[in-house]
């Protein structure tokens, strides 16, 4: 019998904790010997979607391409962990329909908290006008309406949030 794959899509503002959570979940799943791949938005932009900008059209195309790869891996029994801002609700809904086996994780942190966590200085640059189309500053972020999991990273610890995602995978029979 083949294993059922699933895509777990971590969405939220820059600095909310998407990469930290997806890597923490991956570490736990790998410790159990499960097939896992992490598709991190920053790394994907350096390779798979190099050349795309940050306009709405380019961001939607970025999400479609990540969704295409995630669907292929999911179809082959892999647990795919995507960490990408993916600011537009319609684009996330499109990849949800395309992939099928899909769990949306809203990594929810207030803008002020994300700005304080800004290790790359991106918010500072966006506020200074050096970066345009920056989600949360001069570009919108559309929160999910009904995500399967909500991680409030300003209130919950990283281990608590990782456990919420693992429990969601378990309750749906993926783990």
Swiss-Prot record:
Pathway connected to this protein: Sulfur metabolism; hydrogen sulfide biosynthesis; sulfite from sulfate: step 2/3
Active site: 86
Residues that coordinate or bind ATP: 12-19
UniProtKB keywords: ATP-binding, Kinase, Nucleotide-binding, Phosphoprotein, Transferase
EC number(s) stated in the UniProt entry for this protein: 2.7.1.25
Gene3D superfamilies: P-loop containing nucleotide triphosphate hydrolases (3.40.50.300)
HAMAP family in the cross-refs: Adenylyl_sulf_kinase (MF_00065)
Family, as annotated: Belongs to the APS kinase family.
Designated name of the protein: Adenylyl-sulfate kinase
Species whose genome carries this gene: Synechococcus sp. (strain JA-2-3B'a(2-13))
């Amino acid at each position: 019998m083949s294993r059922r794959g699933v895509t777990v899509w971590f969405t939220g503002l820059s600095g909310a904790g998407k990469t930290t959570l997806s890597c923490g979940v991956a570490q736990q799943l790998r410790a159990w010997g499960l097939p896992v791949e992490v598709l991190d938005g920053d790394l994907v932009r350096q390779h798979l979607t190099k050349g795309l900008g940050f306009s709405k059209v380019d961001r939607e195309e970025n999400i479609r391409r990540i969704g295409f790869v995630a669907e292929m891996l999911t179809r082959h029994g892999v647990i795919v962990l995507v960490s990408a801002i993916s600011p537009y609700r319609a684009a996330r809904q499109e990849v949800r329909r395309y992939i099928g086996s899909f769990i949306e994780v809203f990594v929810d942190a207030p803008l002020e908290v994300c700005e304080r966590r800004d290790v790359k200085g991106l918010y500072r640059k966006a506020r200074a006008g050096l970066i345009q189309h920056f989600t949360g500053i001069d570009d919108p972020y559309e929160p999910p309406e009904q995500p399967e999991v909500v991680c409030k990273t300003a209130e919950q610890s990283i281990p608590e949030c990782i456990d919420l995602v693992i429990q969601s995978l378990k309750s749906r029979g993926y783990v």
